[in-house]
């Protein structure tokens, strides 16, 4: 579970990260990363549209992404903000594949900052 300080919570922050951040894509997500001040915590945010599925499916995907992100917190530099926009099809992705894809995408996005 991600602590509140490790989550992107405001709509304005989402907008800034998606517009100004560096993008990396996988088959099931678009990852945007934006560097911030080194004294700020690493933050993750998720955008899951209704095209992914009904509310139960979207919440399942969100919970899985939160679990993956919690494991990636210490591998991302402090102050980095990451937004993961889910594409349709992620709900069918196996857990192991999801972990590998997200770790790879986040690493690539952070490297380009």
Curated annotation (Swiss-Prot):
Any one GO MF annotation of this record: ribonuclease P activity
Classification via Gene3D superfamilies: 3.30.230.10
Top-level lineage group: Bacteria
SUPFAM superfamilies named in the record: Ribosomal protein S5 domain 2-like (SSF54211)
Keyword list, A-Z: Endonuclease, Hydrolase, Nuclease, RNA-binding, tRNA processing
One GO cellular component term: ribonuclease P complex
Catalytic activity: Endonucleolytic cleavage of RNA, removing 5'-extranucleotides from tRNA precursor
Documented EC number(s): 3.1.26.5
GO biological process, one term: tRNA 5'-leader removal
Oligomer status and interactors: Consists of a catalytic RNA component (M1 or rnpB) and a protein subunit.
Family: Belongs to the RnpA family.
NCBIfam families: rnpA
Entries under PANTHER family matching the protein: RIBONUCLEASE P PROTEIN COMPONENT
Function of the molecule: RNaseP catalyzes the removal of the 5'-leader sequence from pre-tRNA to produce the mature 5'-terminus. It can also cleave other RNA substrates such as 4.5S RNA. The protein component plays an auxiliary but essential role in vivo by binding to the 5'-leader sequence and broadening the substrate specificity of the ribozyme.
UniProt-recorded name of the protein: Ribonuclease P protein component
Species whose genome carries this gene: Clavibacter michiganensis subsp. michiganensis (strain NCPPB 382)
Biological classification of the source: Bacteria, Bacillati, Actinomycetota, Actinomycetes, Micrococcales
Gene transcribed to yield this protein: rnpA
